[in-house]
Amino acid sequence: MPDNRLTSHLTTQTSLTDAINSWEAFLSDKGRSPNTIKAFLSDVRLLTSFLPADTTLGKITTKDLNRYFEWMENERAVPCSPKTLARRITATKSLFRWLHQYGVLMVDPAEKVAQRSAISPLPQVLTSEEYDAVLLAADRHRRGSKPDARSYALVYLLLTTGIKKSETLGLKLEHVDLETPNGPQIFIRYASPANRYKERKLILPDDWIPAYNEYLSQYHPTEQVFPWSPRRLEYLLEDIGNEAGLTKHLSFDMCRWTCALKDYRAGEEPDKIRQKLGVSKIQWRELHNKLKQLSGM
């Protein structure tokens, strides 16, 4: 049986605001990140301003929720993108599913609310020629009069592992193991229990190791592998992209998608690519569809 200590005081006569406050405590107990909780609460609190002030949980119907999302999509003064609308529907469904699961509501009014599609445009990726040009531009810094392996160590790591910006910033020296029997690898770690499914070990290319060792001897990082701000690392990528003659904006996201597409075109099993990227099976559906489209271009 679910632990209902956070819902035991809730009834059909409870206000939506009080229910949201209890849900906040539930999300915190589940290990959701502060940013995730903040986003969820922001999304569902809009509903309290739409419904009449005296509306209790038991009075909220599927019709009310559909009318709310129609207002948000077409009538509200503040524009709402398809992606934002889809996220707000997801948050609202999550709240009412929780109230139903824990016995506060006998019927979930959000269950039959249609989820909107929020398919974003296809991401930009590097062509084979651009891929080579980027690595060549980064490698020139290693061979200059003042050798600097930082850019190469960063961009080649991104292009071969597909790790995200947040994962790059969270990567510590202890997460890099060059001596495992299966070859050099990195361990992507997450502090929050809610993100444990994203943790994974990724094989490193052997030819990344010399650049990494050069980088360590030049910069002497003590904890983080790349101890700079997100913006500083973004600038590094932008500079390499410019030096490579790209008309595109080289970014963490572009490197991640380029890595995934390269693996996909090489015939890697889709589920292995999913695990390499650290995404759930639900998230993978859209990513997989985009890889199929990109592969055919």
What residue spans do the PLM features occupy?
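N-terminal core-binding DNA-recognition domain of tyrosine recombinases/integrases
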Residues: 4-5, 21-35, 41-122, 141
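Active-site/catalytic core of tyrosine-dependent DNA strand-transfer enzymes
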Residues: 203-247
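A short, glycine-centered helix-capping/turn motif at helix boundaries
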Residues: 103, 157-170, 266-268, 277
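Conserved tyrosine-mediated DNA breakage-rejoining catalytic core shared by Y-recombinases
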Residues: 170-208
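Alpha-helix N-cap/helix-start motif at helix boundaries, enriched for small hydrophobics
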Residues: 92, 154-155, 162, 166-171, ...
